[in-house]
């Protein structure tokens, strides 16, 4: 009986995926930025201008739409926007 109860608890925790968060780099001017823990429904974003000038890293609800002179990389794994 104890084994069955323990098995149910383990399966419940695995199914709920408790406490998962996303870790992204964040900065304003110069990479690499500091690490920020974002909610699991967020995405990591890295945005830069052509020629590599001015790189911005942050967490967002959605991927940014780049202007004609920008490049954007969005991803959903830890530290992927470095």
UniProtKB/Swiss-Prot annotation:
UniProt KW keywords: Disulfide bond, Secreted, Signal, Toxin
Highest taxon of the lineage: Eukaryota
UniProt cross-references to InterPro entries, sorted A to Z: Snake_3FTx, Snake_toxin-like_sf, Toxin_cobra-type
GO molecular function terms noted in the UniProt entry: toxin activity
Disulfide pairings: 24-44, 38-59, 63-74, 75-80
Alphabetical list of Pfam families matching this protein: Toxin_cobra-type (PF21947)
Signal peptide: 1-21
Chief place of localization: secreted
Localization in the cell: Secreted
Organs and tissues of expression: Expressed by the venom gland.
Any Gene Ontology CC annotation: extracellular region
Family, as annotated: Belongs to the three-finger toxin family. Short-chain subfamily.
General function of this protein: Has been described to inhibit nicotinic acetylcholine receptor (nAChR) alpha-7/CHRNA7 subunits and to bind acetylcholine binding protein (AChBP) (Kd=29.5 nM).
Note: Negative results: does not bind to interleukin-6 receptor (IL-6R). Probably does not inhibit trypsin. Directed evolution was applied to create MicTx3 mutants that inhibit IL-6R and trypsin.
Protein known as: Three-finger toxin MicTx3
The species this protein was found in: Micrurus corallinus (Brazilian coral snake)
Phylogenetic lineage: Eukaryota, Metazoa, Chordata, Craniata, Vertebrata
């Amino acid at each position: 009986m104890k084994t069955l109860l323990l098995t149910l608890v383990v399966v419940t925790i695995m199914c709920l995926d408790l406490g998962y968060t996303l870790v992204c780099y964040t900065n304003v001017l110069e990479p690499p930025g500091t690490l920020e823990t974002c909610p699991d429904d967020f995405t990591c974003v890295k945005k830069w201008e052509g020629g590599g000038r001015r790189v911005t890293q942050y967490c967002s609800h959605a991927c940014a739409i780049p202007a004609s002179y920008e490049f954007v990389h969005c991803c959903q794994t830890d530290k992927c926007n470095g």
